[in-house]
Amino acid sequence: MIQMTVLHLKFGKKGTPMKQYLEALEYILEHGKDRGDRTGVGTRGVFGYQMRFDLRNEFPAVTTKKLAWKSVVSELLWFLEGSTDERRLAEIHFGKPREELVGKRTIWTANADKQAKDLGYVNTDTIKDLGPVYGHQWRTWDAALGFVDQIAEVLENMHYDPNSRRHIVSAWNADRVNVMALPP
């Protein structure tokens, strides 16, 4: 059964975001190559498939299934904070102090309980450090002369040069991948 969520989305040049998404899935099913992955389940993919969305007029939301919007927004806010503590994500998501969230899980809990713990990071009921994951890389990128706050730099640069092609944020810090609970 397919659950449909109705969203008001305007048409872009190539159709709605959902139409582009479904066309991408069809293309991947027909032309994709099966690959192994770290989970042992495997994936099917194609190289370089692109979709483009004009965010001034539309939002690329999947509408053929329930969208975990609260989880998406919570995780994004957590990344923007630069936090590496999975329990902070739980606070944002559930809106309660971490002491009241013992046993509550987020999308990152399993990573904190397995990979991060194996890497030697703090893992208690109220603190679950993940190492220098996405938000840390966005807000505290290790650089030769200190740290770079990529989000602050992009926001500042967009103000002064909105047409620049250099507004880039990356979480792929090759020097830190081996100490991340879940590398990008």
Features from the language model and the residues they span:
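Methionine residue identity
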Residues: M1-M4
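Terminal, non-catalytic protein-protein interaction segments that mediate quaternary/complex assembly
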Residues: G15-P184
